[in-house]
Amino acid sequence: MTKSLIVSPKTAKDIDSRIDRVLKGLGYPEPPLRLEDVRELLRLDLRFYTADNPGYLQEVTNRIFVGTKQVFQRPALLMDAISKLSLQALYLPDRKRILLDDNVPKLKHRWNEAHEIGHSLLPWHQEMMHGDDENTLSQHCHEHIELEANFAAARLLFLRDRFTEEARAMAEKFASIKSLQTAYGNTLSTTLYRFVECIGTEKPVVGVISGHPHISKRTDKFDAANPCRHFIQSPAFAQKFSNVSELEVFKSISAYCGRQGGGILGEDEVFLEDDNGQKHIFRFETFYNRYDCLTLGVHLAPAKSPIFF
């Protein structure tokens, strides 16, 4: 399970200013954002590769230079890494080229492309990609640059604060997420992420992406110890409900969801305990799009304590 992380305020401000310059250069467009217009503005090239036809990737990796130094003296190592790590996209700074895996479902191309555009906009990412020391290659460093690229992608695809303003003006229900998904042309999963983050700065909100929760619909890949692929915490939820586990939340979701093959699987009021031991009521709603199960949980009120006489 992947818990959502939060970019530091200073870095977020820097990234956001770079995204604003891009959108300003495009004349602050209406949604959905056309990524081909972004590529044209930034003079980025887009190509596709597939694991079963690596010829193009072989050619590219043979030509990657920084100055006069060839970064990948053994291009086969990069190709092997792409295969083993299941990389779905790649940005080549010196050639200003984005590579997308054509085997990935088309619905995911948009996010993957925006993620690589995010890398291209952040100069310190390009420095890290060019480096070869231990700090550059550390897992900690990798997680940070991926987090920042995701933040940049979200601010770009959702047109910075425009999405935030629209999300906060709508009902805190899954129907709003579906409406915004249509308007902005992004996937339900990425729209759920942004919706949770935008409406949950002061109110605790949680989102979950998992497989079908009903016991009769679970696949052979279901992992009872890690049932959630993503556990999305709004800033307020992360601050006040840091001890809530994915297992606890998934158990609550499973309790009210039906075995339907698509659409709304159910909704219910769920009790979660904050970091001070106080129970709170959340309204949970779960939707299944036949690929992923998406859950939105919104804080309603503190639970009333029983009165004894």
Give the location of each predicted region:
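Active-site hotspot residues in diverse enzymes, especially metal/ion-binding acidic/histidine motifs
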Residues: M1-F309
